[in-house]
Amino acid sequence: MYKNLLVGLGVILMSFIAVKKEPITLYIIGDSTAANKQPKSFPETGWGMELQSFFDTNVKVDNRALNGRSTKSFITEKRWDAILTSLKEGDFVLIEFGHNDEKIDKPEIGTSINEFKSNLIKYIQETQAKKATPVLLTPIARRNFKNGVLTNTHKGYPAIVRKLADSLHIPLIDMERKTSKVLMDLGDEPSKKLFNYVDSGHVNYPIGKKDDTHLSPYGAKVVAGLVAEGVKETKIGLAKYLIKK
């Protein structure tokens, strides 16, 4: 009797183990606006560092974004190849570039509009070949106010992302528009709290810092929240794992 009971319990236990699913991996590829930061850079914070807090345990965020990278250099440095080796069916890839692609005076990272488009298509097609889902993000806005009006610094690059998403039927999170709205709603001076503005005397920034591109811890949390909002709006499968806040 006891032997049969133990066998039965073993079968039940094995069934639980069998159905336990491996977490979905949510990769982030991009530049310093999303990247993980070293302690020496604090309080500069990438929005990718805050994204995990918006998802339950069914999703594991793997933030591969890195300072100074563009669609070009992320490929030439083999960083994309490293992701492809582990990318599996059911995973997702958030793709946010543009800040460095637009620096065409730096040939190692800068890309023409056409090259930017070709690189994004490569990311999309190779992600889909792995039966994973690519999600395009336009680059977040810089805090660039002129006479109280926020001005665009990204030239035609965000438009390419939007057009590709539309023509190839790829989920799009329009982070340029989302972050621009937040900045405009806050206004010139109040919006500084979203960015890496540091008073002099800080251990990492002895003479202080005024950075209108990179985020503060608060700004990273706000921007990660906008990404999560975008995931919900796209209605992709990832959305069901968002934590209700």
Regions found by a protein language model. Give the residues of each.
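Alpha-helical cap/lid subdomain in secreted, periplasmic
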Residues: K21, K78-P217, K221, G225-K244
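Glycine-centered flexibility sites
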Residues: G30, A65-G68, G98, G219
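Short, conserved aromatic-histidine micro-motifs
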Residues: V61-N63, L242-K245
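Serine-esterase "nucleophile elbow" of acetyl-processing enzymes
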Residues: A18-L66, D81-E89
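A broad, structure-centric signal for solvent-exposed, well-ordered loop/edge residues
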Residues: G8, N36, N58, T71-S73, ...
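Bacterial Sec-dependent N-terminal signal peptides
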Residues: M1-E22
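Acidic/histidine-rich helix-loop elements
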Residues: A35-E44, A65-F74, K103-T111
